[in-house]
Amino acid sequence: MIKSSQKTEGQIVPPFLKWAGGKRWLTRESEVMQMIPPNVRYVEPFLGSAAMFFHSRPTCALLNDFNADLIATYQAIKDDWKSVFALLQAHQRKHLKDDSYYYSVRSSTPNESSARAARFIYLNRTCFNGLYRVNRKGQFNVPRGSKDAVVMPTDDFESISKMLEGATLSHGDFGEVIKKCGQGDFIFCDPPYTVKHNHNGFILYNEQLFSWADQVRLRDELAAAASRGASVMATNADHPSIHELYSDFEISVVERSSVMSSIATRRKKTTEVVISLNL
């Protein structure tokens, strides 16, 4: 039986995905959240787990990500959340019965939209540390993790589907999305954190996906959108190269905990920046 613990009006729907660099922590920064203007079109070119979208609850939105499987998952929930949830429940039952089930799902390539979305969510919740990684062929290759929970008590796909009714979903380059923005738009950007001349391994991994040239292009697109009247907010690494790149923007430093470590005691406090214009 399909069952959804739908939230009452005004309650926050939490992200249903674990995502590296997710901004759920930022939604608890009241000074930052109060900067978001009301009655605007909400635009997010790097959607990820959509923490800011879910917390802000905009009635009109343009949501984009370069990850086609991610956007297809949101689209499937928007179109037919019941089918996605039913398939996720089936994954839960089979996962608990068979230790090899994870790898059979990982190697599968479903074409139907609900099945594709349920596979994406299942792998996100049961893979090692919620990591998203693909090989050169574009195949998801993260090993199974230690978590067995596929269906969560917080799952509320019905409310998510309703929230997405006012959203246009797209898959593509961030620049094409930002070019569409101007007066009456609020842009929130949470790009991969690539910095200039940094030799950290995670940053080098990101460099393959989002180069320093992309960082410069993002800055230019945001500045152009702001000149057209858009309100702009972006997050990034607290690094001298980022401060220099965004020297014509307002910059605030905020503290957070690194949450992607699988061992809580190894999670460290770090700082990031919130960059803004026209707010």
Give short role names for the model-derived ranges.
Residues 2-27, 32-38, 80-202, 217, ...:
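SAM-dependent nucleic-acid methyltransferase catalytic core
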Residues 37-95:
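Conserved S-adenosyl-L-methionine
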Residues 45, 64, 170-172, 189, ...:
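Short His-Asn-centered micro-motif
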Residues 46-51, 156-157, 236-240:
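Short, polar loop motifs at secondary-structure junctions
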Residues 47, 68, 176, 193, ...:
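Short, glycine/acidic-enriched loop or turn micro-motifs at the edges of active sites
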Residues 53-58, 179-181, 241-248:
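Short loop/helix-cap segments at secondary-structure boundaries that form the rim of catalytic
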Residues 122, 274-277:
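Short, well-ordered beta-strand micro-motif
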Residues 184-274:
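Conserved acidic-Pro-Pro-aromatic motif
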